[in-house]
Amino acid sequence: MKRSAVGSFFAGAHVAEAVSLAPLTTLRVGPVAQRVITCASTEQVVDVIRQLDAPAGGRGAGPLLIFAGGSNLVIADTLADLTAVRLANAGITIDGNLVRAEAGAVWDDVVVRAIEHGLGGLECLSGIPGSAGATPVQNVGAYGAEVSDTITRVRLLERSSGSVRWVSACELRFGYRTSVFKQADPSGSQPPAVVLEVEFKLDASGQSAPLHYGELVATLDATSGQRANPHAVREAVLALRVRKGMVLDAADHDTWSVGSFFTNPVVAPDVYRQLAKMVDGPVPHYPAQDGVKLAAGWLVERAGFGKGYPDGAAPCRLSTKHVLALTNRGAATAEDVVTLARTVRNGVLEVFGITLEPEPALVGCVL
């Protein structure tokens, strides 16, 4: 590590020491990192990670965390000697109907730029916090759209070899909130490859992608499968997200979260039929490639966990707007979050026999 009059540097990237990671995540929990290395360019990302991964790379014995927007992370408060690499390579380029975003680009900035250029396909994903590089990892989706609908290829740094290459979408094994990246590293703490850049192929007709999500279709007074003005779709999506506490607002503790903490479980058809016999009234469900997708929020509420649970002054509670969001009420720790998540997951399992899976990366902690 080199020092100069303007600070310390590692492989050309700026280094800060003894940095609290909590303010760098949307959940606002986490440890103090021994150092945070901020990479302002893709070249710095490659050089820094190659050097840290080398046998004598100067990383030390502590763990390594690679992150960008910090919107899908729960980092244990107890992690010691942590080196964090923060991706701040934020370039966005547009060539015809192709949009390329570097990993550290703010995701909503990518959506806005695409819409400003008359390109449709990303508007349903408006308002999602985080970075562009995180989107293919869990195949980010909302309101009837997923990034796998438009991703054509991803540029990667393969950590075992140090090589950089473009990988086509067909190699990424996209599924519901998953990809080859998540399948290789379920915890999100030791990725075998680092996303450097993502390319999207969008619709240059000036129309949105076809609308299928019922709540959004109704808001726009449209019909299922209809296309609309991407600007109008974006505004409708943002309004829906605000109502659910899913647009970041420093003054609103309902937004101090990782978004939906649990994915919607996909179960076998016979499991769905048994569930439908157990309860009064309809069970929200949707067709899925491998079975029937259930609504995790419905399961959570029917298991006895309502909005704002637990009542009182608990530092971590379910959002008052959306039961799938576990929120930091101002003084929560990662352990508080994990404890509540475990309580909810175990409660759903006890009532319905269904295990909910966490959506965020759990670094140094387990449910």
From Swiss-Prot:
One of its GO terms (biological process) is cell division. It catalyses: UDP-N-acetyl-alpha-D-muramate + NADP(+) = UDP-N-acetyl-3-O-(1-carboxyvinyl)-alpha-D-glucosamine + NADPH + H(+). It is found in: Cytoplasm. Pfam families: FAD_binding_4, MurB_C. InterPro entries: FAD-bd_PCMH, FAD-bd_PCMH-like_sf, FAD-bd_PCMH_sub1, FAD-bd_PCMH_sub2, MurB, MurB_C, MurB_C_sf, Oxid_FAD_bind_N. It comes from the Bacteria. Residues 29-205 form the FAD-binding PCMH-type domain. Pathway: Cell wall biogenesis; peptidoglycan biosynthesis. The active site is at residues 177, 260, 359. GO terms for molecular function: FAD binding; UDP-N-acetylmuramate dehydrogenase activity. Its cofactor is FAD. PANTHER family: UDP-N-ACETYLENOLPYRUVOYLGLUCOSAMINE REDUCTASE. Belongs to the MurB family. NCBIfam families: murB, PRK13903.1. This is UDP-N-acetylenolpyruvoylglucosamine reductase. It comes from Mycobacterium leprae (strain TN). The lineage of its organism: Bacteria, Bacillati, Actinomycetota, Actinomycetes, Mycobacteriales.
